[in-house]
UniProtKB/Swiss-Prot annotation:
The modification Cysteine sulfenic acid (-SOH) is found at C254. Pfam families: Mito_carr. Solcar repeats lie at residues 11-102, 111-201, 210-295. One of its GO terms (cellular component) is mitochondrial inner membrane. It is a multi-pass membrane protein. It comes from Homo sapiens. The gene is UCP1. This is Mitochondrial brown fat uncoupling protein 1. It comes from the Eukaryota. The lineage of its organism: Eukaryota, Metazoa, Chordata, Craniata, Vertebrata.
Amino acid sequence: MGGLTASDVHPTLGVQLFSAGIAACLADVITFPLDTAKVRLQVQGECPTSSVIRYKGVLGTITAVVKTEGRMKLYSGLPAGLQRQISSASLRIGLYDTVQEFLTAGKETAPSLGSKILAGLTTGGVAVFIGQPTEVVKVRLQAQSHLHGIKPRYTGTYNAYRIIATTEGLTGLWKGTTPNLMRSVIINCTELVTYDLMKEAFVKNNILADDVPCHLVSALIAGFCATAMSSPVDVVKTRFINSPPGQYKSVPNCAMKVFTNEGPTAFFKGLVPSFLRLGSWNVIMFVCFEQLKRELSKSRQTMDCAT
């Protein structure tokens, strides 16, 4: 097709932030049941004496939740999840190119691997501090079960914000920031840098054009790498965030208890749904992100030319 291509039009910061937020929200809506299954598998084993149903695998978990708690339970915490994407994903993804440009300002060469990694670390860290309260609420709503007469801790998203702030203080909304920071910078670096490098390699070597198939394959590879790298930290983060006050003394204490009580394999609980979720999330998000950036930039340039 003729006309402008992605390389012809450089998206503005506003276009990148908006495109990242919308693409991340769309990906979250589609993959949220997989995320809920991942959370349920990760917190399973915290209370060995509990009579709550045991989950087995991704499909087994999803089936069990639907059968015992209803389909909508798979989307418990979705409003907080969307708030998280708008507040954090838009920043960690939308600011990535801008931070790279800042780090390489005045240099005629392309961004180095070091600058890509530093950009991923920076945007991932900023996003965590801003979006942590939404992560806490999302995880707790996903983890709570209504089985066997267990009274849920929270009745909804805003009820969860209020109760956590009231009973645990405002710091309760930032509980688990340390493991989430570790997880997010690992995922952000691995995800964005791998995607960037794979896309560049495919295009530079004329394997794939800078279009949907290239974005799809690059995103899938990035999702696999990010999942494998972040799984242990992700399990600790989920356990620590979901725990009531006093269950764990600290993040290292949480990690030690997981290791002592359940063994090293517990750090990879929910690995399959994590990959299914992050892999599919990456594909949807990156493909939509690239297309939105391209179309919005072309529309903006067309409007500028018309005026």
